[in-house]
C-alpha cells in the first residue's frame, strides 16, 4: 500500500507536463510497432571484406521476414498458434534469408501473416492484426500484412514475404509501399512453408525503388548488365474496368509518366479478355468440365477460378493431414474455402497445368523482352476493418481476376504506390514476362520518380485538371480508339473517337479516324460528313480525301469521288490508292 501511495505521489509530482510526456511515450511505442512483429531477433551479417574488395551490397540495411520463412532456433508459426504448438524449432535457416544476411543486411524480426498465409485481408483472429499505418481504420492486406506494415512504418528497410494469390502485392497496395512478386521458380522456396506449391513465389517490400532493386539483384543473383528501357507499355483496358475508383486517376499518371520518359509511341492498349480467349484454349475445357461452358464467364474470371482451385487443392495436399489430425480452430471464411475444394482427377490436373503454361506463353508473346503490362493492383481502396467487403463475392471476383494474371502465368509483378484516393493508398501494377525480373526492376527504378510526380493527379483532382488538359485526354481517347479499330471493334472505336471529338472538336484526325470506322460499318453518309469536317479543319489531310472519296463512291457520287481522289494525288502524287481509285472510276464515266 505504501509502495502504491509512493508511486501515486511520484506521478502527481510529475505534474501535467509529466503526464503528457508519459502519454506521448506510450503512443510512440504503439506507432513504432503497429503490431507488425511476432518475434524480435538479430541476425548479423559477416564482417566486410578487406579493401580493395567492394563492401557487401546490402550493407546498412535492416529487414524482417514473414513468419513462413525458417530461421534456426525459431518455430515458423504460419499464422496459427496450433501450428507453433505442434512443430519444432527450425534446424536451419531458409536460404533466402541467409542470402540476404550474407549480402550485408541485418534481420531484426519475424512478422505477422494471415492464418496459414491463405487470405488477402491481413486480419488474423489469433494475433492482434497489424495496423495499417497509411489508413488505420482499414485492413492492411495479406497474407504478409506484418511485413508490409514493418516497411511502411520505417521499422525496417525491406521485408520478405510469400506471394501465392497476392500475399505481397495486396498488402503493398493497401499500405502504400512497393511490393515485388518474383517470377515463379526464380528464387528457391526451400525453408519456406508451402501454401500452394505451383503458385508460391518469393516477394519483398521496400519504400523506394533503389532498395527494391538492390534486394532483387542479391536474391536473383543477377550479374551487372546495362539497364534497359521498355519499348512498349501496354495498358490492359478491360482490367481497368474492374476498378471502383476513377480509372483516369491511375491511367493518366502512367500515361503521362511514360510519355515524358519514353514518348507516346510506346503506349499501347490491349483487351486481355479477347487476347486470352484465343491464346489460352484450355480455358474452354476448364469451363466445360466445371459446367459453366454455356454461361457467359469472362476469361479473367475463369483464370481466377483456376487460381483459387489450385490454391485450395494444393493447400490441402500440403496440410490436409495435419488439419485432420490436430483439428485447429480455423477462420470460418478460410475453412469454407478449403472445404469447398473437390478432389481433382489426373485429367483435370493436366488441364490446369496446360492453362498455366498457355497463359505464361501468351503473356510472353504479348510482352516479348521489352514490354510491360499495366493493370490495377486491386479494384478499390482498402476495405474498412471488420467489414464484409473483402469477403463479398463481388470484391473477391474483381480482386482475384486481377491477381490471377501473374499468379497463373508465374510472371513477375510489382505494386507501385500512386498516392491516395479518399485518404486511402492506391497503386498500379506492372507485369513483366516470366524471367523478366531484372527488366521489371529496372523499369520501376526508371519510372518511379515521374510516377510520383504525376501521382498528384490522383491525390488532388484539381491538380489533375491542370496536369491533364482536354487535348491530352482527347489524345488518350483517340489512341484507345485506334486500338479498338485494330481489333475490328468498329462501334467501340466510333465511341472513343466521338469522346475525343467531344474533348477537342478542332482536330481533323479525330473526324477522319471516325470516318474510317463508319466506312467499315457501311455508314457512308456519316463517313462523308466526318471527312468534310476534317478537310475543313485541315486542307491537306490526305486520308480524309481518300475516305470521303470511298464514301462518295459507295453513295453513287462518282464525280465527287473522282475529285477527292484527284485532290489526294495533288497532295501525294505517288499515292497508289488514289491513283487506282481515280482510274477505276473514270472507266465508268
Swiss-Prot record:
Signal peptide limits: none
UniProt GO cellular component terms: chloroplast; chloroplast envelope; chloroplast outer membrane; cytosol; plastid
Tissue specificity field: Expressed in roots, cotyledons, leaves and flower buds.
Intervals, Chloroplast intermembrane compartment: 1, 163-398
Membrane disposition: Multi-pass membrane protein
Compartments reported by the entry: Plastid, Chloroplast outer membrane
Protein name in UniProt: Outer envelope protein 64, chloroplastic
Function: Chaperone receptor mediating Hsp90-dependent protein targeting to chloroplasts. Bi-functional preprotein receptor acting on both sides of the membrane. Not essential for an efficient import of pre-proteins into plastids.
Amino acid at each position: 500500500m505504501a509502495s502504491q501511495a509512493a508511486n501515486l505521489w511520484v506521478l502527481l509530482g510529475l505534474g501535467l507536463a509529466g503526464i503528457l510526456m508519459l502519454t506521448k511515450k506510450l503512443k510512440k511505442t504503439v506507432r513504432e510497432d503497429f503490431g507488425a512483429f511476432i518475434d524480435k531477433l538479430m541476425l548479423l551479417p559477416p564482417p566486410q571484406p578487406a579493401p580493395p574488395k567492394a563492401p557487401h551490397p546490402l550493407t546498412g540495411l535492416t529487414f524482417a521476414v514473414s513468419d513462413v520463412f525458417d530461421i534456426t532456433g525459431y518455430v515458423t508459426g504460419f499464422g496459427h498458434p496450433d501450428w507453433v504448438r505442434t512443430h519444432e524449432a527450425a534446424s536451419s535457416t531458409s536460404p533466402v534469408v541467409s542470402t540476404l544476411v550474407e549480402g550485408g543486411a541485418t534481420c531484426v524480426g519475424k512478422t505477422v501473416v494471415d492464418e496459414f498465409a491463405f487470405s488477402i485481408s491481413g486480419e488474423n483472429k489469433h494475433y492482434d492484426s497489424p495496423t495499417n499505418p497509411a489508413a488505420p481504420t482499414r485492413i492492411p492486406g495479406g497474407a504478409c500484412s506484418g511485413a508490409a506494415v514493418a516497411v511502411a512504418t520505417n521499422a525496417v528497410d525491406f521485408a520478405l514475404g510469400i506471394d501465392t494469390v497476392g500475399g505481397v502485392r495486396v498488402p503493398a497496395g493497401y499500405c502504400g509501399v512497393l511490393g515485388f512478386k518474383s517470377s515463379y521458380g526464380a528464387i528457391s522456396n526451400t525453408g519456406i512453408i508451402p501454401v500452394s506449391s505451383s503458385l508460391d513465389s518469393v516477394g519483398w517490400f521496400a519504400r523506394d525503388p533503389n532498395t527494391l532493386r538492390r534486394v532483387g539483384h542479391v536474391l536473383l543473383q543477377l550479374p551487372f548488365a546495362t539497364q534497359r528501357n521498355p519499348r512498349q507499355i501496354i495498358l490492359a483496358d478491360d482490367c481497368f474496368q474492374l476498378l471502383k475508383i476513377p480509372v483516369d486517376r491511375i491511367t493518366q499518371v502512367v500515361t503521362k509518366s511514360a510519355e515524358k520518359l519514353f514518348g507516346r509511341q510506346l503506349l499501347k492498349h490491349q483487351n486481355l479478355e479477347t487476347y486470352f480467349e484465343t491464346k489460352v484454349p484450355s480455358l474452354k475445357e476448364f469451363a466445360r468440365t466445371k459446367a459453366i461452358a454455356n454461361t457467359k464467364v469472362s476469361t479473367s474470371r475463369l483464370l481466377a477460378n483456376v487460381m483459387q482451385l489450385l490454391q485450395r487443392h494444393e493447400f490441402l495436399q500440403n496440410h490436409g493431414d495435419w488439419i485432420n489430425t490436430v483439428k485447429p480452430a480455423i477462420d470460418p471464411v478460410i475453412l469454407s474455402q478449403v472445404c469447398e475444394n473437390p478432389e481433382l482427377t489426373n485429367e483435370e490436373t493436366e488441364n490446369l497445368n496446360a492453362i498455366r503454361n498457355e497463359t505464361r506463353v501468351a503473356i510472353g508473346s504479348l510482352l516479348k523482352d521489352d514490354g510491360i503490362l499495366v493493370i490495377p493492383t486491386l479494384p478499390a481502396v482498402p476495405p474498412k476493418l471488420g467489414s464484409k467487403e473483402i469477403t463479398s463475392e463481388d470484391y473477391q471476383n474483381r480482386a482475384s481476376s486481377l491477381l490471377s494474371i501473374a499468379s497463373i502465368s508465374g510472371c513477375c509483378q510489382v505494386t507501385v504506390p500512386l498516392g491516395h484516393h479518399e485518404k486511402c493508398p492506391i497503386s498500379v501494377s506492372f507485369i513483366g514476362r516470366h524471367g523478366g525480373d531484372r527488366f521489371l526492376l529496372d523499369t520501376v527504378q526508371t519510372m518511379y520518380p515521374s510516377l510520383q510526380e504525376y501521382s498528384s493527379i490522383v491525390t488532388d483532382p484539381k491538380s489533375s485538371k491542370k496536369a491533364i488538359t482536354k487535348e491530352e485526354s482527347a489524345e488518350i481517347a483517340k489512341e484507345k480508339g485506334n486500338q479498338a479499330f485494330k481489333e475490328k471493334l468498329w462501334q467501340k472505336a466510333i465511341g472513343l473517337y466521338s469522346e475525343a471529338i467531344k474533348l477537342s472538336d478542332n482536330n481533323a484526325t479525330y473526324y477522319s479516324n471516325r470516318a474510317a470506322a463508319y466506312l467499315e460499318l457501311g455508314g457512308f453518309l456519316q463517313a462523308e460528313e466526318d471527312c468534310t469536317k476534317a478537310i475543313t479543319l485541315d486542307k491537306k489531310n490526305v486520308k480524309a480525301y481518300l475516305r470521303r472519296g470511298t464514301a462518295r463512291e459507295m453513295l453513287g457520287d462518282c464525280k465527287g469521288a473522282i475529285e477527292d481522289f484527284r485532290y489526294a494525288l495533288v497532295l501525294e502524287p505517288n499515292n497508289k490508292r488514289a491513283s487506282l481509285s481515280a482510274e477505276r472510276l473514270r472507266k465508268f464515266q
